[in-house]
Amino acid sequence: MSAGVRWKITWENDLEPSDHAELSEFFRATYGPTGAFNAKPFETGRSWAGARPERRAIAYDSKGIASHMGLLRRFIKVGDTDLLVAELGLYGVRPDLEGLGIPHSIRALAPALQELAVPFAFGTVRHAMRNHVERFCRDGISNIVTGVRVRSTLPDALPDMPSTRTEDVLVLVFPIGRPMSEWPSGSLIERNGCEL
C-alpha cells in the first residue's frame, strides 16, 4: 500500500450506515469481477457475506476504500481439539492495488489481535491464491496448513439444501499468543458457523 493510506481499526458497532454503504459498494466492485455470485451478498447494502465481523481493518486512500479485512473471535474444532481463534476473512483489495494488501492488513490488525489475546488467527483462501499467500508466508507471519478441509454452516437454512458445506481450501494460520508448534493436528476444521 502507498504511504498515502490511512488505516481505521474499528469495532463493528462503531460503523455508521454510511460506512456499511461504502463497504458494500467496495465489495461489489472487488468481488464482482470474480463472479456475480460472489458480489450478490452485497447487493442490498450489506457489508458482510456470512458471519458478521467483530472488528475491521479498513484502509483508505485518496480514491476511497483501498483494502478491508474483518476478524471474528470464535471457537473452532481442529480434529478433536476445541480452539479459540480470531478468524480473518472478508478480505478485499481494490483491483488497482492487487498484490499489496494482505501483509499490510495483517500488520494493521496485529495490535487488535494481541489485544484480543487469541492463541492463533486463521483464515482460508482458494487454491488459486496459493502463489499470492506463499509470498506472504515467506515473512514468517503466517503458515499454510495443507491437507485440511473446512466444514461451515451456510448463511441461509433452506429446506431443499444441506445446512453445511465442506471445502478443500488453503488454511492460513497466524501464531499470535502461542507458537505454531501448538496448532492442533487434524484433517478437518469444524467452523461451527458461517465463514467470515
UniProtKB/Swiss-Prot annotation:
GO terms for cellular component: cytosol. The keyword NAD does not apply. The keyword NADP does not apply. It is found in: Cytoplasm. GO terms for molecular function: acyltransferase activity. Pfam families: NodA. Gene3D superfamilies: 3.40.630.30. Keywords: Acyltransferase, Cytoplasm, Nodulation, Plasmid, Transferase. Its EC number is 2.3.1.-. Belongs to the NodA family. HAMAP family: NodA. This is Nodulation protein A. It comes from Rhizobium leguminosarum bv. trifolii. The gene is nodA.
